[in-house]
Amino acid sequence: MATHAAGAGTAQATIEALLDELRRGAGAREIVGIGVGVPAIVDTAAGVIGEEAHNVPELAGVPLATALRTRFALPAFVDNDVNALALAEWRFGADRGVRSLVVLASGTGFGSGIVLDGRLIRGARGFGAELGHAPVKFDGPPCWCGGRGCLALYASGRGIAEAARERATTASGRALAEAAGGDPRRIDAPLVFRLAGAGDPAATAVIDEACRALGAMLGVVINGLNPEVIVITGGVAVAFAALETRVLAAAHEYAFKRARAGTRIVIAPGDKRSSMRGAAALAFYELEERKR
């Protein structure tokens, strides 16, 4: 099924078409609810996707949960995709059964999800786990969210690419520019990681900063939330897995010694099935919450 059509209404239509296909595939099996994770802030009480839906702007302001309930006559729940992913790790992952878990997802952007004492942390308006836009450098550059020095600027795919593009315009970044065919706009995170692995100084500086920024956030999470498990996942986590020693060394600089000793940090690159499990986990979680 094509999933990358663009324009007003196309994202909702794609979701509905996919759900139709899944319902046909379910056959006689009972469907108890629908879960959807979207890369945006979601007001879960109202079921409305927020204005910050930069990756799916056609969904901004859409009451998707209500629309799906009406369309399919089933309970339907919509939340941030990394919140859903955290529920999947908590319910289905290798560490299922723990009471507290934090997911940090480094992909194009940087998201996070928090489960404490068996409850998903959303905050008052759905902003409760936006650690990707917590500052790790108070005098850092402006972020696309409107803040400054956010973690996403340093440890997301977009942030790593943009930092490398800036360096590519300097003398020390000549190799970065050459690797991109002379066009800095073609620099992406995989290229930066590859050049850093080959020893290029400019690329190495970008990746060093990414590791330190991620380590600083691990320190914040360990000291502030004291979870049993932190899972680092997402498309960029594949590259961070090879740098695990550097990331953990940075985390050890910022976290209380006894607190970090009690927190297991796992770098586990996800896949599309992880997102599907997240959608299912969200529906199960919300249905169970109704019974409390």
Which ranges hold each PLM region?
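ATP-binding/phosphotransfer module of carbohydrate and carboxylate kinases, centering on a glycine-rich
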Residues: 1-33, 43-48, 66-74, 88-98, ...
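A charged helix-plus-loop insertion that forms the helical arch/lid used to bind
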Residues: 47-61
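Short beta-strand segments
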Residues: 35-39, 102-109, 113-115
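General beta-strand structural signal in soluble alpha/beta enzymes
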Residues: 76-80
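Active-site-adjacent loop/helix segments that line or gate small-molecule/cofactor pockets in enzymes
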Residues: 82-86
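Active-site glycine-centered loops adjacent to acidic/histidine catalytic or metal-binding residues
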Residues: 81, 107, 279
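Structural signature of FAD isoalloxazine-binding scaffolds in flavoprotein oxidoreductases
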Residues: 127-130
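Short clusters of small/polar residues that mark proteolytic maturation junctions
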Residues: 1-2, 53-54, 125
